[in-house]
Amino acid sequence: MVPDAKHAPLPCPCGRPAYDRCCGRHVGTALPAPDAETLMRSRYSAFVLDRREHLLATWHASTRPAAIEPPPPGLRWLGLEVRQHRLTGPDAAEVEFVARSKLAGRAHRLHERSRFVRDQGRWFYLDGEIDPPVAG
């Protein structure tokens, strides 16, 4: 039996098939992400859905801002490409990604290598390098 469109799961903003089985398990819940890539995907979804509370809750206290500005009116996130996820230590990881968006009719591309740390068993976003150099 094929599910009808009214009951089909919503696609996840991060590009995976179903939000409720992907980033929806972490955005707005207490369930921690099992790894840095999953956390990064949930943070992208939080940007798409304007869930700033999730962004702040998953930002490490040592670098977390006091608040996050609302997105500019008309901003549309178009897609996420995860290029690399690697552990850099027992409690550290990097995720390189490209996120595409459109604002006021212009296409934008954010290429970032984000650093994550595991603190008391939970992964947190630490910081990121925009337009990182190509690894050689």
Swiss-Prot record:
UniProt-listed InterPro entries: NTF2-like_dom_sf (IPR032710), UPF0225 (IPR023006), YchJ-like_M (IPR048469)
Top-rank taxon: Bacteria
Gene3D superfamilies noted in UniProt: 3.10.450.50
Matches recorded under Pfam families: YchJ_M-like (PF17775)
SUPFAM superfamilies for the chain: NTF2-like
UniProt family annotation: Belongs to the UPF0225 family.
Protein name as catalogued: UPF0225 protein Mpe_A2093
Organism, scientific name: Methylibium petroleiphilum (strain ATCC BAA-1232 / LMG 22953 / PM1)
